[in-house]
Design a protein with these regions (language model features):
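Long, low-complexity, Lys/Arg-enriched
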Residues: 1-109, 116-164
């Protein structure tokens, strides 16, 4: 099994909470990925804007607390307008082209639960076009009482299994 790298946006809403200990009672998708018993994350590339640096620092510290074996790599991506499709796609494409992907050695999951809808669509398109050579990762909270660990699903975009 190859080392696993997860790439995903900091959720400025979903990952946010009060900065005290009660944050551990809430599902935060980015942190919850690294709390999964059946998913070992070797590296987490956390995409975030400068305006969310404080939240990014807290989330990175929390990932290190729950998963000390996970290397957390912050990646600053600033958008003038995070809802501008062209800007978001272009900056994510630049990120993808500059990132040292090595799919022969590492596996990649692209987290699409956080970020604006525009960012989620762009991540999907870049993964589908293999600029991001991985599978999609989707997370969601568990039903019932609030708890920090949710569910996760891996989505492969290889549609050849549907060929007749």
């Amino acid at each position: 099994m190859n080392p696993l790298t997860v790439i995903g946006f900091l959720g400025s809403t979903l990952d946010a909470s009060k900065f005290g200990p009660t944050r551990w009672n809430k599902w935060r998708p980015t942190v919850s990925i690294c709390m999964q018993e059946d998913l070992r994350v070797d590296r987490f590339v956390l995409l975030h804007g400068k305006q969310h640096q404080r939240l990014a620092d807290i989330v990175m510290d929390d990932i290190r607390d729950v998963s000390p074996e996970t290397e957390v790599s912050p990646q600053l991506l600033n958008f003038d307008d995070p809802w501008d499709f062209e800007e978001v796609y272009t900056k994510l494409l630049d990120f993808a082209q500059d990132f040292p992907f090595d799919p022969e050695v590492n596996d990649y999951l692209i987290h699409i639960t956080t970020g604006t809808h525009v960012a989620q669509i762009c991540l999907f398109l870049l993964t589908e076009a293999r600029f991001l050579p991985g599978k999609l990762l989707q997370t969601q909270p568990r039903g019932g009482a609030p708890q920090p660990i949710g569910h996760w699903a891996q989505i492969a975009l290889d549609l050849s299994r549907y060929d007749s």
